[in-house]
């Protein structure tokens, strides 16, 4: 088994606390509404949203995958940090054991924030992670973030 780590950063004009609340804490409800072309629904399989919670993320018709199951590993409300692992479905299967993800939202002096993202792909055997797989995952995350950001800009009273 190998572990391939990919890190990225992206910025947002939304304050860190508000984005954490909307994108992370309430994302299961908000994202299917603001980005139905990317995620059709999120089901809570077990748990209360904290560590150990299992969620099933369903994708719309025509998407390359029907679903993924995520396990919440950490929710740090003070430091705006969220860790979760993709444990089933989507790209996880013959070549990948799981994908561990860490999102940390850091406030910036201009009132916005930076999202620091780390993705660890845990492969099976000697398999390597393909660049297009990492690119597709990054693009999906960016699509979801921008949809939430647009919603928050249009609804200044939401998720404060």
From Swiss-Prot:
> Do you know which PROSITE patterns this protein is assigned to?
PATHOGENESIS_BETVI
Q: Where in the cell is it found?
A: Cytoplasm
GO terms for biological process? abscisic acid-activated signaling pathway; defense response
Any GO MF annotation of the entry: protein phosphatase inhibitor activity
Query: Sorted alphabetically, which keywords does the UniProt record give?
Result: Allergen, Cytoplasm, Pathogenesis-related protein, Plant defense
Q: Does the keyword Cytoplasm apply?
A: yes
Positions bound to brassinolide: 55, 82, 84, 101
Q: Name one GO cellular component term.
A: cytoplasm
Short name of one Pfam family:
Bet_v_1
Q: What does this protein do?
A: May be a general steroid carrier protein.
Similarity annotation: Belongs to the BetVI family.
Identification of the protein by name: Major pollen allergen Bet v 1-G
């Amino acid at each position: 088994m190998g572990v391939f780590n990919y890190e990225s950063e992206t910025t947002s004009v939304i304050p860190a606390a508000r984005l954490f609340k909307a994108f992370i804490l309430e994302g299961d409800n908000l994202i299917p509404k603001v980005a139905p072309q990317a995620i059709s629904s999120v089901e809570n399989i077990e748990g209360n949203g904290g560590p150990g919670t299992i969620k099933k993320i369903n994708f719309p018709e025509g998407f390359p995958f029907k679903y993924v199951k995520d396990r919440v590993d950490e929710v740090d409300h003070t430091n705006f940090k969220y860790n979760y692992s993709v444990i089933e479905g989507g790209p996880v299967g013959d070549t990948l054991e799981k994908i561990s993800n860490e999102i940390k939202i850091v406030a910036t002096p201009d009132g916005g924030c930076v999202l620091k993202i780390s993705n660890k792909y845990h492969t099976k055997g000697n398999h390597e992670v393909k660049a297009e797989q990492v690119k597709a995952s990054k693009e999906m995350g960016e699509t979801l973030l921008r949809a939430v950001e647009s919603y928050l800009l249009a609804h200044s009273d939401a998720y404060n």
